UniProtKB/Swiss-Prot annotation:
Compositionally biased tracts (Basic and acidic residues): 574-591
Record family assignment: Belongs to the class-II aminoacyl-tRNA synthetase family. Type 1 subfamily.
Subunit structure: Homodimer.
Top-level EC class: ligase
Entries under InterPro entries matching the protein: Aa-tRNA-synt_II, aa-tRNA-synth_II, aa-tRNA-synth_II/BPL/LPL, Asp-tRNA-ligase_1, Asp-tRNA-ligase_1_N, Asp/Asn-tRNA-synth_IIb, AspRS_core, GAD-like_sf
Source species: Mycolicibacterium paratuberculosis (strain ATCC BAA-968 / K-10)
Protein name: Aspartate--tRNA(Asp/Asn) ligase
GO molecular function, one term: ATP binding
Function according to Swiss-Prot or TrEMBL: Aspartyl-tRNA synthetase with relaxed tRNA specificity since it is able to aspartylate not only its cognate tRNA(Asp) but also tRNA(Asn). Reaction proceeds in two steps: L-aspartate is first activated by ATP to form Asp-AMP and then transferred to the acceptor end of tRNA(Asp/Asn).
Chief location category: cytoplasm
GO cellular component, as recorded: cytoplasm
NCBIfam families: aspS_bact, PRK00476.1
Length: 591
């Protein structure tokens, strides 16, 4: 070993020992005839002092981030010089020898000062020398170990599934890989291990897990990565309660790493309730401000804007005092979200209603409105009217915006909730508008994925009442972030084919794309279900950072670019020729 001790491990009890340390020069201070450096390694920092004339001469050439090895005697710092801010603050190492292991060029940014994200990612190997980014990566390793410990205790088997496979429609675009030995044909990087983990259940593995790399060629959205990680699990002979129970045990083990005890059982809310009360299928329950249904209240209104299939409201406490320019700003805020605006009524301190909407209301509506929505004098009532889904989504976004503006969210709080019983299908146009890829060519597509089982009792309504079929599915939400989602799966070929048909996949197309799965279901497939946790998002929450990029060792930018390696990059003509990327496949011959 090039060193005898870790820099952060030395204490006053080590005084008198000769040690050899190795690490980086975090800071250098020249005090005339004495030079001090803060020597940093993965364990922490120790102050090294150079007094010996021969070693002092060498130390003059040290600069920030030189990699060095130092041998010397551990000494108690002189009285008054202790540093209580660091664990090694009572001691210093009096150097008797110095070896420069690697010099450093001038730094592109100072490691103890803020730097722009693109510069940080371009020099990520320097960024990770900082304490906060390094701590996030190290915590992630502990998170992996904690999850594995729980799963191993419950007899799960860790199995690796393929990372180059067949392109199958799963709700997003595939990254495609040309197959050089099969010109004109392509592999795909998996969007998830979904099909393989179901096949592992057919294979009798019974309990599978994997910390899986997944790939989705999505339009770039804020805080998304083209490659991401999920903790993937699947179990045979279970119902939703079994999957939820093991999931809660895993989450409790993870949050215990940061000293938080998750109250269990985690509360549940139906998808329908979440949308009606919070305007979101991933509600943040750290604050109240529930939406209020007003459709019945305004059923006889003469105000044309409120003559809509849905009218709802959310109250902003104290919002009546907002100046006109702020209220106008809310209209721009709503328009940026695709709405025409955000109607509002101001409740005066005397209880009188003001604002442009109030004068369009009947006397009875004005008299009863504040009581109906729970508004007090001085509050502002925001409204949305129109189709229920987009109107509730707008109010849900307004609810979150109000909470942020009023400081209603305790940043130290944790609020977990299961969202259960979502619809199995949604209109394909809605999925496309949200940036997803509809699996088939039908009017309906799957809300989660095409392999989710309908809730018991809904099987007969798949074709006849498609929009009202509920899924046997469950999402786990933390502080308004969906951190995991799962379901009981279809394990019968006939039901799977019916679901495909509703989504516009005819028998031939289903056979072409999913024939291997359908065939597997004919060999005694067990009932099974599972869940996948968004590992990057969970780690970001545990490290209390805003972006998942902070918990990924070498992330891409929001635009999918890696500033470090300058990927993606063009390929050469030779690579293009060898890959067969331009070869058109021969038409399939009829059997």
């Amino acid at each position: 070993m090039l060193r005898s001790h870790a820099a952060g491990s030395l204490r006053s009890s080590d005084a008198g020992q000769q040690v050899t340390l190795a690490g980086w020069v975090a800071r250098r201070r020249d005090h005339g005839g004495v030079i001090f450096i803060d020597l940093r390694d993965a364990s922490g920092i120790t102050q090294v002092v150079f007094r010996d004339p021969d070693v002092l001469k060498q130390a003059h050439r040290l600069r920030a981030e030189f990699c060095v090895a130092v041998t010397g005697l551990v000494e108690i710092r002189p009285e008054g010089n202790a540093n209580p801010e660091i664990a090694t603050g009572d001691i210093e190492v009096n150097a008797s020898s110095l070896t420069v292991l690697g010099e450093s060029a001038p730094l592109p940014f100072q490691l103890d000062e803020p730097a722009g994200e693109e510069l940080r990612l371009k020099y990520r190997y320097l960024d990770l020398r900082r304490d906060a980014p390094a701590s996030a990566i190290r915590l992630r390793s502990k998170v992996n170990a904690a999850a594995r410990e729980v799963l191993d205790r419950h007899d799960f088997v860790e199995i690796e599934t393929p990372t180059i496979t067949r392109s199958t429609p799963e709700g997003a675009r595939d990254f495609l890989v040309p197959a050089r030995l099969h010109p004109g044909s392509f592999y795909a990087l998996p969007q998830s291990p979904q099909l393989f983990k179901q096949l592992l259940m057919v294979a009798g593995m019974e309990r599978y897990y994997q910390i899986a790399r997944c790939y989705r060629d999505e339009d770039f959205r804020a805080d998304r990565q083209p490659e991401f990680t999920q903790l993937d699990m699947e179990m045979s002979f279970v119902d939703a309660e079994d999957v939820i129970a093991i999931s809660e045990e895993i989450l409790a083990a993870l949050w215990a790493l940061i000293g938080y005890d998750i109250p269990r059982p985690i509360p549940r809310i139906s998808y329908a309730d979440a949308m009606a009360r919070y305007g979101s299928d991933k509600p943040d329950l750290r604050f109240g401000l529930e939406l209020v249904e007003c459709s019945e209240f305004f059923k006889d209104t003469t105000f044309r804007v409120f003559q809509a299939p849905y009218v709802g409201a959310v109250v902003m406490p104290g919002g009546a005092s907002q100046p006109r320019r702020t209220l106008d700003g809310w209209q721009e805020w709503a328009k940026q979200r695709g709405a025409k605006g955000l109607a509002y009524v101001l409740v005066g301190e005397d209880g009188e209603l003001g604002g442009p909407v109030a004068k369009n209301l009947s006397e009875a509506e004005r008299a009863g409105l504040a009581g109906h929505v729970g508004a007090a004098p001085g509050d502002c009532i925001f409204f949305a009217a129109g189709p229920a889904k987009p109107s509730r989504a707008l109010l849900g976004a307004a609810r979150s915006e109000i909470a942020h503006r009023l400081g209603l969210i305790d940043p130290q709080a944790w609020a977990f909730v299961w969202v259960v019983d979502p619809p199995l299908f949604e209109p394909a146009d809605d999925a496309t508008a949200a940036g997803d890829v509809a699996v088939g060519s039908g009017a309906w597509t799957a809300v989660h994925h095409a392999f989710t089982a309908p809730k018991p009792g809904y099987e007969d309504a798949i074709e006849t009442d498609t929009g009202n079929v509920l899924a046997d599915a469950y999402d786990i939400v933390c502080n308004g972030n969906e951190i995991g989602g799962g379901s009981i799966r279809i394990h019968r070929r006939d039901i799977q084919e019916r679901v495909f048909a509703v989504m516009g996949l005819d028998h031939a197309e289903a056979q072409e794309k999913f024939g291997f799965l359908l065939e597997a279901f004919t060999f005694g497939a067990p009932p099974h279900g599972g869940i996948a946790f968004g590992w990057d998002r969970i780690n970001a929450l545990l490290s209390r950072v805003d972006s998942i990029r902070e918990v990924i060792a070498f992330p891409k930018t929001g635009g999918g670019v890696d500033p470090l390696t300058d990927a993606p990059a063009p390929i050469t003509e030779q690579q293009r020729k060898e890959s067969g990327i331009d070869v058109k496949p021969e038409p399939s011959k009829p059997h």
